[in-house]
């Protein structure tokens, strides 16, 4: 079931990136497209498929197992940060956005990363094909899981507040509603990760994967829908 969720989500990501292919050169849209791409990278790195390939190569280079999982988690943090920037530039001047990002986002993000990376490395885990399906009671991994989840929840709350402001525009209402649902699944996934960090077993794995895939899939579809709606205004049919 997990593989089916991942494949379906990757298909939506590819669709979204194809729809948004022209936005790589659009100043106001490129960060949203980067966020979709980063979520795709995160999904691949966290997937059980990456463990016997990327995971083994990274272990040979660094001597630490499951590094690809940590990189996937960091990609998710980067994706949410990119989406926050995309929202902020619609509400404030770019120079003000830089100040806000530096003061309100970069500090908690870098503090979280400064805790997560050493905790992950020092935990000295064994090989795990699926990080979510084999939560560890290792105290350092609990620190890692709680810190990472706290960062994601903080960013999700921050971006949700921005979305509620942007939702006042009737043209953006449907897309913002999709984004809010996506953030809801993200919050559910991170909460389940924290809860499962203290429990031995693999019962939480399918729930976490379902929430992660639904969050990423809905966000990617919403991003594609948003750009199709915006680009329609410039089509010849609309111009007439």
Please provide the spans of the model-predicted regions.
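Membrane-proximal first intracellular loop
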Residues: 1-69, 172
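Generic alpha-helical transmembrane segments
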Residues: 5-10, 76-80, 142-161, 214-218
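Internal transmembrane alpha-helix with an interfacial aromatic "cap," most often the third helix
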Residues: 15-18, 68-106
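Membrane-interfacial loop-to-transmembrane alpha-helix junctions, especially the N-terminal start
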Residues: 24-37, 100-106, 171-182, 204-211
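C-terminal TM-helix exit segments that contain a strictly Trp-centered aromatic cap at the helix terminus
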Residues: 43-46, 114-124, 189-194
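Membrane-interface interhelical loops and short amphipathic "cap" helices
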Residues: 51-65, 125-140, 196-206
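Membrane-proximal helix-loop-helix units in multi-pass membrane proteins
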Residues: 91-156
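C-terminal transmembrane-bundle signature of multipass membrane proteins
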Residues: 150-240
């Amino acid at each position: 079931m997990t593989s089916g969720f991942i494949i379906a989500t990757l298909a939506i990501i590819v669709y979204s990136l194809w729809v948004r292919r022209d936005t790589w050169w659009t100043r106001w849209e490129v960060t949203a497209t980067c966020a979709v791409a980063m979520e795709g990278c995160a999904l691949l790195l966290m997937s059980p498929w990456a463990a016997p390939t990327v995971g083994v190569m990274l272990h040979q280079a660094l001597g630490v197992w499951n590094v690809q999982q940590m990189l996937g988690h960091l990609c998710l943090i980067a994706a949410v940060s990119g989406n926050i920037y995309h929202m902020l530039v619609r509400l404030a001047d770019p120079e003000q956005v830089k100040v806000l990002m530096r003061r309100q986002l970069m500090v908690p993000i870098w503090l979280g990363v400064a805790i997560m990376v050493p905790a992950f490395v020092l935990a000295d885990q064994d090989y795990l094909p699926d990080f979510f399906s084999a939560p560890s009671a290792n105290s350092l991994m609990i620190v890692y899981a709680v810190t990472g989840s706290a960062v994601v929840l903080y960013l999700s709350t921050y971006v949700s507040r921005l979305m509620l402001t942007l939702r006042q525009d009737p043209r953006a209402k449907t897309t913002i509603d999709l984004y809010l649902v996506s953030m809801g699944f993200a919050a559910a996934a991170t909460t389940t990760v924290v809860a499962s960090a203290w429990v031995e077993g693999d019962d939480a794995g399918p729930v976490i994967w379902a929430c992660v895939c639904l969050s990423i899939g809905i966000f990617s579809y919403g991003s594609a829908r948003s750009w199709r709606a915006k680009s329609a205004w410039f089509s010849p049919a609309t111009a007439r």
